[in-house]
A protein has these predicted regions:
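Gly/Pro/Ser/Thr-rich low-complexity, intrinsically disordered segments predominantly at protein N-termini
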Residues: 1-196
C-alpha cells in the first residue's frame, strides 16, 4: 500500500520499518502507528523564526556535547517493548531538537527522547503540536518542550518534573528573555526571534 492511501485508512497502524520504505516524496510522521502527512511547506515567517532560534541555540551550545537538528530529522520514540527499529510505532520530525546524548544519534536520526524539542505552531499543525505531541513528548521523557506561537509572538516552555509530567509552562512574549532550565546557558531574546 502506498502512503497516498494511508490517510484514508487511519485504523491501520504502521511501524518505522514500513515508514522507512515509503518513497512518494512526501513527509510523514507516525504517532503510535497513525500516519500524519507533513507535506505542506512551512510559511516564510515560520522558517525565519526557526533559523533565528537554531542559530542562537547552536551559538550557546558551541563546545558542549549537545547537537541541534531541525526538520526533516527523524526522531524515533520506541516504547519499552520495541528493541528493533522496524517495530517502533512512533517517528516524528519536530521543527528543532537538541540531543545531548550522542548514543541516541545514528545515521537515521535520533532514537529516544531528545533533551529539548521545539515546535513552531502553524494552522495545519497547532492542534497536533499542543495536544497529541505534548502528550507524546511527556510520555517519552522529553526534558523540555518549547512551543512557539508566531501569530501571538509567544513561547511556552514546558519542563518535565520529577513525577515525569510537564508542569505549568513558563510563558514568554516578545521582548522577554527565555531561559532553558535543561540546557545550561541557553537563552533567547524573543525580540530577536520575532523580528521580521
Amino acid at each position: 500500500m502506498g502512503p497516498a492511501s494511508l490517510a484514508e485508512k487511519m485504523e491501520e497502524r504502521f511501524t518505522y520499518g514500513q515508514y522507512y520504505q515509503w518513497d512518494d516524496g512526501e513527509r510523514w510522521e507516525l504517532i503510535d502507528g497513525v500516519p500524519y502527512n507533513m507535506t505542506a511547506a512551512p510559511v516564510r515567517r515560520h522558517q525565519g523564526i526557526l533559523v533565528r532560534v537554531s542559530s542562537r541555540i547552536e551559538e550557546f551550545l558551541r563546545d558542549k556535547p549537545c547537537q541541534v537538528y531541525f526538520a526533516p530529522f527523524d526522531v524515533r520514540l520506541p516504547d519499552f517493548s520495541e528493541q528493533d527499529d522496524n517495530d517502533v510505532p512512533t517517528v516524528v520530525q519536530p521543527d528543532l531538537v537538541v540531543v545531548c546524548d550522542e548514543k541516541k544519534l545514528d545515521d537515521r536520526g535520533c532514537r529516544g527522547a531528545p533533551d529539548l524539542v521545539l515546535e513552531i505552531l502553524s494552522p495545519s499543525t497547532s492542534r497536533k503540536d499542543i495536544g497529541v505531541k505534548f502528550s507524546l513528548y511527556e510520555r517519552h521523557g522529553v526534558r523540555e518542550y518549547w512551543i512557539i506561537h508566531p501569530a501571538e509572538e509567544s513561547l511556552m516552555v514546558f519542563t518535565i518534573g520529577e513525577d515525569g509530567k510537564y508542569g505549568r509552562p513558563q510563558g514568554y512574549g516578545r521582548g522577554d528573555l527565555a531561559i532553558s532550565t535543561v540546557l545550561e546557558g541557553v537563552e533567547l531574546n524573543l525580540e530577536e526571534v520575532f523580528a521580521e
